[in-house]
Amino acid sequence: MRQIAFYGKGGIGKSTTSQNTLAAMANRHGQRIMIVGCDPKADSTRLILDAKAQTTVLHVAAELGAVEDVELDQVLKPGFGGIKCVESGGPEPGVGCAGRGIITAINFLEEEGAYTDLDFVSYDVLGDVVCGGFAMPIRENKAQEIYIVCSGEMMAMYAANNIARGVLKYAHAGGVRLGGLICNSRKVDRETELIENLAARLNTQMIHFVPRDNVVQRAEIRRLTVEQYAPEDNQAQEYNKLAEKIINNEKLTIPTPLEMDELEELLIEFGLLAATKKIVRNKLQHKMQQQQKK
């Protein structure tokens, strides 16, 4: 059994990318998969289940009084391709640590024997910054392969570098390795070249470039993966290619994160930092002009 995790900047399309890829792994390649959602939004399994946000382990435990009172079938639901789906959940906004939900859920699943008869366990983890709680799948050596979903946008690359730094921190103590960068395209100029360059500097690979296609949004509106909604579409083939690459991936490395000035040099080299600063400068000038008119 292989334990993988998808990390990435908030809003980058991490949950969408992971569910579409895992759907192809299960449906086309017969892989037995369990998804453990590690995001308080509980949206890591929505497309696989063709349903609204799944009831979380923490929610059921709170209703019953303790996690020891929870039955496995109350929180583990089968979805498309036989994929088992669990959402860890989190506390009320502003109260407690969301990372605690991940720890509670994983311990519960292990004690209940949920990790048997599987080829892959996939953790879908919130993460602009790998804080202690959200790093739990890495820190406790649960997730062995980390895939970072990013794009050619500056903040997505900044987050990818931060996550690589978190992987490095625990790589020597445990067996966690970086499996590669998944570029979820935002149609940035020279995006493929940029992410390949970043991957090389991080001592990893751009495992796949996922082109931007509106069919993904059309499927999402219907709470479906592209594999279910339009299996013959070119986008379904792209997710299948990524699925194959993950199944056959042997390039698992210890990352070499960049210093901030090195990352900025890379962005300058590709003209991205200058363009971003120009946009910010124009916005500030416009704001000042508006204030002067008042």
Swiss-Prot record:
What domain of life does the UniProt record list for this protein's source?
A: Bacteria
Q: Quick check: keyword Nucleotide-binding in the entry?
A: yes
Tell me which EC number(s) this protein carries.
Answer: 1.18.6.1
Q: Where is the signal peptide?
A: none
Provide the binding site for [4Fe-4S] cluster: 97, 131
Residues given in the record as ATP binding sites = 8-15
Q: How is it modified after translation?
A: The reversible ADP-ribosylation of Arg-100 inactivates the nitrogenase reductase and regulates nitrogenase activity.
What does the record say about how the cofactor binds?
A: Binds 1 [4Fe-4S] cluster per dimer.
- What is the required cofactor set for this protein? [4Fe-4S] cluster
Q: Which residues carry this modification: ADP-ribosylarginine?
A: 100
Q: Which keywords belong to this entry? A: 4Fe-4S, ADP-ribosylation, ATP-binding, Iron, Iron-sulfur, Metal-binding, Nitrogen fixation, Nucleotide-binding, Oxidoreductase
InterPro entries in the record: NifH/chlL_CS, NifH/frxC, Nitrogenase_Fe_NifH, P-loop_NTPase
User: What does the annotation say about its assembly with partners?
Assistant: Homodimer.
Family per record: Belongs to the NifH/BchL/ChlL family.
| Its biological purpose | The key enzymatic reactions in nitrogen fixation are catalyzed by the nitrogenase complex, which has 2 components: the iron protein and the molybdenum-iron protein.
Q: What is this protein called?
A: Nitrogenase iron protein
